[in-house]
């Protein structure tokens, strides 16, 4: 018994105390920096009950939601997950720790780059970060070294690829003093030795689960995210909660093993005496009572009390890699994520596959015949064509021209058969053969031709004959004149299929056939050399908007906005402009009398007449003085009146309603060139520049505003004087689009652009007109027999031939001879049966009807090539043969007309990312887009250069007549003061009575406003086209500029921006031309006025500012005044 007790004590000590004492060396120190983690969720591993660390999901107060069965996930939301670091790690991080996360990616994020965890310092510079890159299938760990530089360690292993398969996975990173260890699904993937780390500033902020492009939460399903203060924890963690397939059923060993042994998942199995090897690295502990102490080996002990939890054991050696888990269940479709920010331009992708052939367009108009090309080289032999079905018999061609007399040929084959003999006995019935079968050569010798027999009954089909041997080429005949064209022979019988001939020369191009079936996708061709840039083409028409495409994957962050371009050089001064007549100036001081000169031109306006009677006072409350209206047109010049007496100065009346705008002035001299902004879309530039020139929609007519209230009368200020000319005001809001202007003259040609890339192969064009007959070609090889021709006309009666000797009895025709391959069987015609015995020659009878086809003759000798005949009409298309191998690409055909737009196809799967395309040709202005969302006001831009003098606007409607002002008090006549210095020009006095008619002046030159209008249009178009040509030549890569700003299609045009800052005052206009002579005034001559005083009246006081006018219509911004807010530069975390 004493030995038994000692053995029990030794067993207890070696089983429990020894591992417990050893484990004390690897425990963390939670009392220093790490709190104890909560334990209610860790029933799969008992030792986790005393783990210390940080649960980032709880620290960020993330909400829970069910994501698969009873598995819960954190809802990441749509706001950046960022907290103060000191709140997450109040006492900092230990030097060694472990990061453990369990998640699965979604379809939209399996190719995204995102931060799992990131600590920033107070300057928002990254100190520690863990990056998961779905595009490169890598995991990156970054920290700052002891010298402050960023150190980035990239783990790129084949074992990491399943991390992005949209299944649940555990990822762990063990951070030790000089070692980084990466675990996935409880397996060690790789370890890296690192340099010494720098201390971490915990006064900054911490970010989790954020996209690298815009910082928004990444679209993943996150189950847990913890940081353990024990760097060796990952080697002990189990993956039982990943999938049921990770947990094998418990065997008998599980019920007898101690809690310490099972909790370590077999990693410390060598410490257990007599313990068998575990079959799997994952042993899941059932949630039930724990096993007690083991009993003695030779006696069954009583159940012991529940043991105390054991300490952490020593780190076991890494186990063998587990088997690959089964594919997880399909995840529930997640919510649609928010639209991501534009990423940076990605690397050039591989060449995309060739697109499918488009639908056939309508036939284009036949182009003009091109010039005759040089004779091409002999093409390579084409692939052997399969025998197609017999085509439908074509129509008989027109008789050819009479050829030249040929040379004398060699002795021909035997002549036509003699006169008909008596009918022979019926032949034996031949075997039924399919149409076009093969014939074997007969065994009998060829007898002499007998006399022609009478027409026998139609015989049964004979046996097929075999292919005869190829005949030798005969010697060339003696040269003689060409014989006359013979009569058309009778159609021969269908022969057997001949031996495959050598490939013939390429035939003439056939008619355009119907489109073939869609071929298989060919392999992508290699990138050809870059062609020289082409001329700038005409803009293409705006296409119909396509269907909504599949949401693209997020790109890399974009780069910074490029610096604005330098302003263009100042243009040369233009020719002086032509202006409209100005108003007549006031009289100057009287000059000294000169000698009598010749008859002068029209005189200056006369002095103002005496003031009229005071009108009755107006009715109504005095209103504020309105703003100054535009000057009205000069009225008809009345006759000069007599000098009137000086009137009493009255109170200044209210300003009248605004008069109509004057007619458009001629263009002034050109100013500095407009610094056109580098817009990403030329269409938007043109729209802003000329108010949507393409649409040509007349502007809406402005609605006449309500009458303003009557202004208050201004107070009389005798000391007031006319103010100096104020600075040029800011440009008004642009008016609405005016009516369609007259067609301008053709502009100057633009600058020659670079040659464009080689276009796509065009659709084969229609056959061109037949060219002139070329020289006779070389002798061609013998072609295949042509289709059976139509029955010819009856030939003229030939001279009777000599009767041939009687032939020997024939052999039963069960097989044909070998030359039947040269002919085709007519429908319903059969091989003749036995020939009858030769009869005596009968008397010459009348020409009988055309007989059946005669017996097959021997092949004739090869004749000389005949003169090329005229091209016959095209026969009907034959039955389609089997598709041959694809031929070499033909020359591009004449472009056809644009076909009708086909139906919009279904959205296809996104193809692989292709390389950045070359810049396309600028298209035409697109159709006006839908009203965009009101953009945010942009920052105030720098002061622009001085703009050109604007073109005078159209004449506005005539304002209504203002209400009369109150009658002013009559002032007393003051004493005549001394003559002062010449004052500024005073306001015009009251209208005097009409004077006597003046002497008619000489007529002035007429001004044609249509010519002025035409000249304005011509000058505006010329300046616009010159500047557009310079702008387009400088803008060499519009597509590259667009792609640098954003990916994807450009959005609809935004609303008009806020008006820009006022420009500098424009240059003073030129003096107008002399106006036409006015019509004589109408009215009775007035009575002579009283002489006026020589003193000039005091100027009236300036009126008070008028009421605020109604807001004008929303205008379009001038391109040089438009402000385009630059996107803020994206802050990227650096990495090494």
Swiss-Prot record:
Motif Cell attachment site per record, residues:
946-948
The signal peptide, as residue positions, is 1-23
**Quaternary assembly:** Oligomer; disulfide-linked.
Ranges for domain Laminin G-like: 47-231
Q: Where is this region: Triple-helical region 1 (COL1)?
A: 289-348
- Where does this protein come from, organism-wise? Mus musculus (Mouse)
Cell division as a keyword of this entry, yes or no, is no
- Ranges of compositional bias, category Basic and acidic residues: 302-314, 332-344, 472-490, 714-725, 737-758, 937-948
Keyword entries, A-Z: Cell adhesion, Collagen, Developmental protein, Differentiation, Disulfide bond, Extracellular matrix, Glycoprotein, Hydroxylation, Myogenesis, Repeat, Secreted, Signal
Q: Per the record, which residues fall in region Triple-helical region 2 (COL2)?
A: 367-426
Start-end of Low complexity biased regions: 254-266, 387-401, 428-437, 511-523, 567-577, 634-645, 764-788, 877-886, 1087-1101
Family of this protein: Belongs to the fibril-associated collagens with interrupted helices (FACIT) family.
Q: Which Pfam families match?
A: Collagen (PF01391)
Map out region (Triple-helical region 3 (COL3)) in residue numbers.
442-682
Q: Which residues form the Collagen-like domain?
A: 292-346, 347-388, 389-430, 519-577, 578-618, 620-673, 722-777, 778-810, 833-891
* Triple-helical region 5 (COL5), as annotated region: 827-1006
Q: What is known of its domains?
A: The numerous interruptions in the triple helix may make this molecule either elastic or flexible.
Q: Supply the name of the protein.
A: Collagen alpha-1(XIX) chain
Segments for region (Disordered): 252-272, 289-673, 699-1005, 1043-1136
Kindly list every residue the record annotates as glycosylated: 47
- What are the subcellular locations of this protein? Secreted, Extracellular space, Extracellular matrix
User: Where is the region Triple-helical region 6 (COL6)?
Assistant: 1048-1105
List every stretch annotated Triple-helical region 4 (COL4).
Answer: 694-812
